[in-house]
Amino acid sequence: MIVRNVKDVMGTEDEVRTDTWVSRRVLLKKDGMGFSFHETTIFPGTRTHIHYKNHLEAVWCIEGDGSIETIADGKTYELGPGVVYALNENDEHWLCGGKQPLRVICVFNPPLTGQEVHDAEGVYALVEEAA
């Protein structure tokens, strides 16, 4: 059994920070669950281009506000507590922070190793862990 507190990830290499978000990666590929599990905060007033070509992601919004805009059709969806969205078709999108920090719980398949950051195209590369 794996039991962790997200507080134990803070300040470690499993807490990844960019200009627009901070992600605490609680379960990773090395844990052998077949998915990774993260608590992420999107900073207010930010806009992040994302296009997960190699991963599927489900996101549960638990606090704050923001929006997601799909690039293919320009649709915008408001995000807030209780909203779930799934990028089941590797949907390219803009993730926008609102007036308050947007706190979300994310599940990725295949699982992340922990150190991924978006490249210039908004993609997480498939990363193999060192043996």
Swiss-Prot record:
Q: Which reaction does it catalyse?
A: (2S)-4-acetamido-2-aminobutanoate = L-ectoine + H2O
Q: Which Gene3D superfamilies match?
A: Jelly Rolls
Please verify whether the record's keywords include Cell membrane. no
GO biological process terms on file:
ectoine biosynthetic process
Q: Name one GO molecular function term.
A: ectoine synthase activity
Q: Which residues cross the membrane?
A: none
Query: Which pathway does the database say it acts in?
Result: Amine and polyamine biosynthesis; ectoine biosynthesis; L-ectoine from L-aspartate 4-semialdehyde: step 3/3
Write the record's keywords in alphabetical order, separated by commas.
Lyase
Which CDD domains does the protein's record reference?
cupin_EctC
The protein's Enzyme Commission number: 4.2.1.108
Q: Which PANTHER family match?
A: L-ECTOINE SYNTHASE (PTHR39289:SF1), PTHR39289
Q: Which family does it belong to?
A: Belongs to the ectoine synthase family.
Q: Could you identify this protein by its name?
A: L-ectoine synthase
Q: Which organism is it from?
A: Bordetella parapertussis (strain 12822 / ATCC BAA-587 / NCTC 13253)
